[in-house]
Amino acid sequence: MKTNLIPFIFLAIAIFACGSDVDDPKEEVIDKLDLRVTIPAGANSWVVNSTQQDETVVSDGGIHNWTSLTDVLRTYFKTSSSGELHVGFRIKSPEGTSKIKVTVGNDSKEVEISNKEYKIVEIGKFNISSSGYHYIEVQGLEKTGTYIGDINDILIGGPAVGSVTFVPTENSYFGRRGPSVHMSYKEPEGKDIQWYYNEVTVPEGEDAIGSFFMANGHAQGYFGMQVNSESERRILFSIWSAFNTDDPNQIPEDYKVLNLVNGSDVTVQDFGNEGSGKQSFKIFNWKAGTTYKFLLKGEPSVNNSTDYTAYFYAPEVGQWQLIASLRRPQTSTHLERLHSFLENFVPSTGNVSRKVKFGNQWVYTIDGV
């Protein structure tokens, strides 16, 4: 198979809100600007210069607890048209008076906020030269109180707004994580696949926190590498139980995935919340720009079960390392539905670009092909 380049550029829709509490916004009549589209701030905004601040400032209810003048917030959305864009905020200043700067493209406007109850504040008119993804950026310039402002919604309209795409509040968690990108492989017809090999290279600068570069996926599990934090990276191998539940404590004994053996410094534990089963991981500081190799074996075992064994090769180690061998009861099969994917599992980095190259894939069947 040829090398495939998967760009993962998440441009969503966002908005910012800030302050100390969340009140029901006051409805207002709009006279001057066309502000017919309401984008929920909490589902579509990020503090783009600080992941830690994002977790503090952005919530499902909007942007609150916004205190730092260094925070840069962006709300993403997609339009079907270009032209004049009207912008307004449903905003309040919890205490004192604040001045904010709002930027679209190369044009910025400064607005003073002093109202203590939510109201729609017109920001102004901007121009966007093309359809597609855009963002509205806001930064605090001055404040007399603790908080800069609370923003519940971003409102847009004007000729540039034909149809608009953004994340609704009820989809905030997955919307802020961004879309996952999946790639399937054509398998040899009528053959039982026992081994599945793949190589993974993450370009330098594309290894954002929250990335899961999943190399060897199949019908019953997945195997790849993650960026878990600024200081921790993992090689992860997981197998789902055949029992359908998100709570691993609900799995009957005869459906529980068994750990047959695991490699050195590998942690094996139950997992849930996305189906349930057994996961194994090795903390390993893999590097962007380096090619890593993943090898997975799947074959029927005793009493209607299947054994899955995962091996990982890092050039800096120079030898294959066993991650784990896991047995899935109530299933007798070989490897099937082979695929790879790239996803983000940290909502506060869902606006960040990430890429991966998968290459040199091959499979080996029980017939020796």
Predicted ranges, named:
Residues D24-N285, K293-V369:
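Extracytoplasmic
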Residues T3, F8-I9, I13-R36:
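Bacterial Sec-dependent N-terminal signal peptides
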